[in-house]
């Protein structure tokens, strides 16, 4: 297994801290709004990593957090006259629904920052005791980055990073020093009683503490195997996490760092400030979650993905092919083709080379369809094909539906009944040799994007886009 390590800026062999075990921490959302396509892409990227490792024989522990203490949450809760707990719970539920729709496997642990306040306080106390942190006159506590000789080692390769972007805060020793604890400022602020005084943790200390409490190994030079997240988190968030972990515990946070690329909307970086954020829930109104997943995983996780509906519909054709083949082999039993399994897994073991894996899949779909055309009653072949498709379902998380359900996506139960009634009406018209009426019904349904297919077993229908 090879993965791209952001810190080393190259592909390296994955050599876990404990043989055949993989501990992964993925930075989750700050829950003050609905999740957007950037969140979806990150979740799917590292879901693919997890699935690949598991199918390669690793026991995977994946932790993905919820940041439920943050200035953005506090400000929005104040605006909507809600507590931060009420507001964050709304968006945690929304995020969970969205990821379920995208068939992202549930993490081993899903910690909330609010559940680990004591751990954060202990870590800050350690940093103060070791003289890596200092308090300013308003009670805030900062990490003194000048004490960490390796500060910047994770993100320094990115020449666009400028510490000056952070801005000056009165009494900070260096511009890049970052807040560990924000003291309670009175009205409209949120604070928790603690030995540090009333206040709340900074963003970066939240993740480091949750890593330590949920995943960290002891007696190793690294706490976990892989720390992952979006490229936008590399600096300052991941840099600061790495720094405070070194300072507090004398070890590196992660052996490997992985980052997924940005999502652009019509060739422009997606961001709330530009007003072009595309929420997952809005995309799901138009497209099934599996169709979205299939599209989002089709571009290598480190590349920029330029979201547009034309490409999405093109990618759907691949999913259609999977279900067409599945339709032909349902109800058979057999073993997977070992060469197919080996070849496609090796693609994914090469830093999740999904483009190459999909090429292998396309070849399998084409060749097995051709073999079925030549020998449609070959049960052994059908069983092998179904086993191949089952492996794709486990590896890529697509192709898991019943084909009939897939080809009727987006049609309500009442609409289905209306279609069935029309099919019966057409059947009667044909029996009475009223072929003009039968054709008229077919055309009427076509206008509703419903295609009819007459088979020896009767008429079936599908919805098309």
Where are these regions (language model features)?
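Alpha-helical recognition segments enriched in aromatics with Gly/Pro capping
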Residues: 1-32, 47, 118-332
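Active-site pocket-lining segments that scaffold enzyme catalytic pockets across diverse folds
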Residues: 95, 100-106, 124, 128-133
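Short, glycine/charge-rich beta-strand/loop segments that flank catalytic centers
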Residues: 66-70, 92-95, 105-120, 138-147
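Short phosphate-binding/catalytic loops that engage adenosine nucleotides
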Residues: 58, 132, 450
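The substrate-binding groove and active-site-proximal loops of carbohydrate-active enzymes
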Residues: 78-84, 108-114, 230
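Structural preference for alpha-helix termini/caps and helix-kink/transition segments
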Residues: 269-272, 276-465
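N-terminal, positively charged nucleic-acid-binding surface of large information/translation enzymes
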Residues: 8-13, 17-103, 454-461
């Amino acid at each position: 297994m090879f993965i791209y390590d952001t810190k080393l800026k190259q592909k390296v062999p994955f050599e876990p801290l404990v043989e055949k075990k993989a501990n992964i921490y993925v930075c989750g959302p700050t829950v003050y709004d609905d999740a957007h396509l950037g969140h979806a892409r990150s979740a799917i990227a590292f879901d693919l990593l997890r699935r690949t490792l598991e199918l390669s024989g690793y026991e995977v522990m994946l932790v993905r957090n919820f940041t439920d203490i943050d200035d953005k949450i506090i400000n929005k809760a104040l605006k909507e006259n809600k507590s931060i707990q009420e507001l964050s719970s709304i968006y945690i539920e929304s995020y969970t629904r969205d990821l379920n729709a995208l068939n992202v496997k549930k993490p081993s642990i899903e910690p909330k920052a609010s559940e680990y306040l004591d751990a954060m306080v202990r870590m800050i106390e350690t940093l103060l005791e070791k003289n890596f942190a200092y308090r300013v006159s308003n009670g805030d506590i900062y990490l003194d980055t000048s004490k960490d000789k390796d500060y910047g080692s994770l993100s320094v390769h990115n020449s666009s990073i400028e510490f000056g972007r952070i801005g000056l805060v009165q009494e900070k020793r260096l511009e890049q020093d970052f807040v560990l604890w924000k003291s309670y400022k009175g009205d409209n602020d949120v604070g928790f009683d603690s030995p540090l005084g009333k206040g709340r943790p900074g963003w970066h200390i939240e993740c480091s503490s949750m890593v330590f409490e949920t995943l960290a190994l002891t007696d190793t030079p690294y706490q976990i195997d892989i720390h992952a997240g979006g490229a936008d988190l590399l600096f300052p968030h991941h840099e600061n996490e790495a720094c405070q972990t070194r300072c507090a515990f004398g070890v590196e946070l992660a052996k490997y760092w992985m980052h997924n690329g940005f999502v652009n909307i019509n060739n422009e970086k997606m961001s709330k400030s530009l007003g072009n954020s595309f929420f997952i829930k809005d995309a799901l109104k138009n497209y099934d979650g599996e169709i979205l997943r299939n599209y989002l995983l089709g571009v290598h996780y480190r590349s920029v993905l330029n979201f547009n509906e034309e490409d999405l519909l093109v990618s759907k054709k691949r999913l259609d092919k999977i279900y067409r083949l599945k339709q032909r082999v349902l109800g058979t039993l057999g073993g997977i083709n070992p060469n197919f399994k080996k070849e496609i897994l090796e693609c994914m073991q090469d830093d999740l080379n999904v483009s190459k894996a999909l090429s292998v899949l396309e070849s399998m779909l084409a060749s097995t369809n051709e073999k079925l055309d030549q020998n449609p009653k070959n049960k052994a072949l059908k069983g092998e094909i179904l086993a191949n498709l089952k492996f794709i379902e486990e590896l890529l998380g697509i192709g898991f539906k019943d084909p009939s359900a897939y080809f009727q996506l987006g049609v309500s139960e009442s609409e289905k009944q209306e279609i069935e009634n029309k099919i019966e009406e057409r059947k009667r018209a044909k029996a009475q040799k009223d072929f003009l009426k039968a054709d008229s019904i077919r055309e009427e349904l076509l206008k509703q994007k419903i295609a009819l297919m007459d088979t020896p077993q009767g008429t079936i229908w599908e919805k098309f886009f």
